[in-house]
């Protein structure tokens, strides 16, 4: 009886329904993974990281040396970074990197500035790559970007140093020995995973120039940290059993080995970013396969945003871009960001001195066609299942008129167009 019930059509249908949404989500994420060229982006970042690793660590340690409390922790902080982010077979890499970093201390002022510029370029590339995943079209303003990059470059080392000091205090005061010794070993084994998850959570939460939900960034950080640990174990196994770097390159084998590891790291980081992006923008509702062609696709959303800015303006207040992105005007926050950027770029709205948005055109004289003709291509299309803004009777009448006009104009048989195109070919 139980076997019959388990294999019933209803049970099979429920099981299919449970698997349908995860399958659609993975398909959505895979499409964006391919579209964003994640593997190529990871290779580009790995190459730039390889060139910037020594300058970045040198600048970070120089910043820490400014504060006496961190001055004696150089080796501890280096060990912290290698323990959490380097593979198990990284002893040789660690030795070479420390040699390179020690040599940077003899550089002149110009050389030091050059190291800072290289480090900032790496942070800028990471910023542009992650914002590309979140489909941010407009770059950060120069001062805003510089402030963010400089904050990361200066506060990042301080946070790491503070973490090392705090963990050392807890380590030697709470887990001094005795019955807590076993707990000390257990905590030690989980620290790299926890530290990696926190670092990636902050990366996904802070860097994208979009609103990212806390739980999405946290889930992405945990997933990427787990993948990170798997990558470390696989890399250690691969190097120990299959890698031929040393046989081919000899003493230089550390360079391709380090590049390969950094490449794996960036694949994991960018995969986690795609996971977080997909959590925010995936909609499991399937589109209507028989949906009628809509010549005004995207226009109601643009007008909804313009209307929200206008209504706030005439009421005496101004909507900021941040408030718009956190509002429920459009469920698809990525498309909402594109609309705001389009309206600002084409001077339909402008930012006030207080950072609010104000309508910049005369809505009584400007026509819909003037708006429509300037809309970028990406606003005319949407991902399957993404919600649209409901519109009124005027739009329905306009759609019917456009469809009728298109139908009358496009009565030409396709063979005539094909022949005409063939005749024009050289």
UniProtKB/Swiss-Prot annotation:
Is Cell membrane given among the entry's keywords? yes
**InterPro entries cross-referenced by the UniProt entry:** UPF0761_bac, Virul_fac_BrkB
State a single Pfam family of this protein: Virul_fac_BrkB
Q: Where are the transmembrane segments?
A: 50-70, 106-126, 146-166, 187-207, 217-237, 250-270
Query: Where located?
Result: Cell inner membrane
Which keywords label this protein?
Cell inner membrane, Cell membrane, Membrane, Transmembrane, Transmembrane helix
Ion transport keyword on record: no
The record gives the membrane topology as: Multi-pass membrane protein
Q: What is the top-level taxon of the source organism?
A: Bacteria
Gene Ontology CC terms, in alphabetical order: plasma membrane
Family recorded in the similarity comment:
Belongs to the UPF0761 family.
**Classification via NCBIfam families:** yihY_not_rbn
HAMAP family per the UniProt record, alphabetical: UPF0761
Q: What is this protein called?
A: UPF0761 membrane protein Cpar_1343
Q: Which organism is it from?
A: Chlorobaculum parvum (strain DSM 263 / NCIMB 8327)
